[in-house]
């Protein structure tokens, strides 16, 4: 179950040579989740199978980003744009999550009965996006009917801060990869 997960990694768009080793290291230990978000040039069946196999060792969860795939037979993470435009039917046997930046997106995630949301950017990130801060993160997390993860500028050490503000865990690219 996603409720057991404290860390959700997100793959870099352009993975480096040591990417699969980093994926294996990421999946070591406790159960985690990984959102596959790759540039089309790297989105191959071979790579996806290797990631899926690595996840099985720790009973971890693989989720596909909607930028790559909105298949009905997979765990799917919706970008905020895809969330707001989503008209599909919810598949109950699979996870559905979404990226949220404001109350309107949180409400849409509630309407779709998403299992989790990533709220961002909580802190100043490498892209210079304006952070919402921990207080706003807590407000948005409280307004969501499922579980929430902090994303954007967070580090592994911020896990307790996320939990203290009503979150379940943290999510990120650079903090894991």
Map each language-model feature to its residues.
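Catalytic cores of alpha/beta
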Residues: 22, 26, 61-76, 101-113, ...
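Glycine/Thr-rich beta-alpha phosphate-binding loop at enzyme active sites
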Residues: 73-82, 94-139
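Glycine-rich phosphate-binding active-site loops on the catalytic face of alpha/beta enzymes
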Residues: 80-89, 116-130, 156-177
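N-terminal active-site wall of soluble small-molecule enzyme domains
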Residues: 26-89
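N-terminal amphipathic alpha-helix/helix-capping segment at the start of soluble metabolic enzymes
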Residues: 1-22
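Active-site beta-loop-alpha junctions enriched in small/polar residues
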Residues: 10-14, 39-41, 67, 81, ...
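Alpha-helix-loop-beta-strand connector modules within alpha/beta enzyme cores
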Residues: 49-63, 83, 89-102, 130-153
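Hydrophobic faces of well-ordered beta-strands that scaffold small-molecule active sites
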Residues: 5-11, 32-36, 62-64, 76-78, ...
